[in-house]
């Protein structure tokens, strides 16, 4: 099993291109099931999660072709027909977002059998809201032996969908299912994340009639069919925020290109409050910290445009060496402080009580062997390793490979001493 080793102490100086958003790309890939014409996605990240979903889509009848073009990395998806409505456990378990093939399959072919998902083990994260949305659109849902059986032989029907609480995944799933439904669907209490706007833009380019994404109310007027399209995936705001934190942690000057700083205003405001410099550019931003120690600041996670829960672990790593005490409140997921004990192995002073962590900054972290527990926790350990004295080795980095493209290459190009150690012990520089 691969590991990543970091020798701390080097500043970061250079340019990091931000990849396309994983959380958007995987939903856009699922949209290919809705049409018999090709869907071309540009600015596509190459990640374990997109590979997993590509395998699943291939099984369902989608022809998946990756290439490099003038618009960067591209993926062409073409499903002239759905050859199977069965999404097995061995594929769906690898990534919970692959469950979102259920709605498109039912919308286009009238039936599906999809395994209940796996993925990051952060809290309960039930799929109940997804199923309620598909049922509201007229599908008959049965659960049996870990599988969801969904049928709508006469097609889906437009409906009012009211979520009791905000769910990004359920909102996306409802949008994917409703675009081919007969009539008008209205999603109330919809999530407002920018990835939903990206999904709306792609679906509309394919001929759908979706409006309101990015607001709490999304309206979808069903159409008989969708056609092919070309769509550029939005930049990954979590990757952007992660490298912004890494630059503030290690010091130096890092330019983030192909980025949209407005998507992470909540984080950038906190970086400035802590003492880092943030300068917006035509295609991104520049993060600087020139030697001065950062000051501890408090954060509380919240739905967009608030502080993203997917950046909480990274910010906790940043606060481990800040001057003073910071309080970090997690309001989105329970059990999302699993990275805290691993940061403590590096010398961090952290105490956790319920949904709040207190981080008392220390003068110096010390390198050690640590273990990634989930996707965002894994990169927080890499960030801490950038300043830890000596070598930090992070194991179980398959979590990292799910969401960060060429991380060692991007950090290494800015001066970080980071390398991948292959499962047989051989380092990959």
Curated annotation (Swiss-Prot):
Catalytically driven reaction(s): phosphoenolpyruvate + UDP-N-acetyl-alpha-D-glucosamine = UDP-N-acetyl-3-O-(1-carboxyvinyl)-alpha-D-glucosamine + phosphate
CDD domains: UdpNAET
Entry keyword Transferase: yes
Modified residues (2-(S-cysteinyl)pyruvic acid O-phosphothioketal): 120
Pathway the protein acts in: Cell wall biogenesis; peptidoglycan biosynthesis
EC number: 2.5.1.7
UniProt keyword annotations, A-Z: Cell cycle, Cell division, Cell shape, Cell wall biogenesis/degradation, Cytoplasm, Peptidoglycan synthesis, Pyruvate, Transferase
GO CC term (a single one): cytoplasm
UniProt record, GO biological process: cell division; cell wall organization; peptidoglycan biosynthetic process; regulation of cell shape; UDP-N-acetylgalactosamine biosynthetic process
Highest taxon above the source species: Bacteria
InterPro entries per record: Enolpyruvate_Tfrase_dom, Enolpyruvate_Tfrase_sf, MurA_subfamily, RNA3'P_cycl/enolpyr_Trfase_a/b, UDP_GlcNAc_COvinyl_MurA
Residues where UDP-N-acetyl-alpha-D-glucosamine binds: 96, 125-129, 310, 332
Family under the similarity heading: Belongs to the EPSP synthase family. MurA subfamily.
Protein name as catalogued: UDP-N-acetylglucosamine 1-carboxyvinyltransferase
Gene: murA
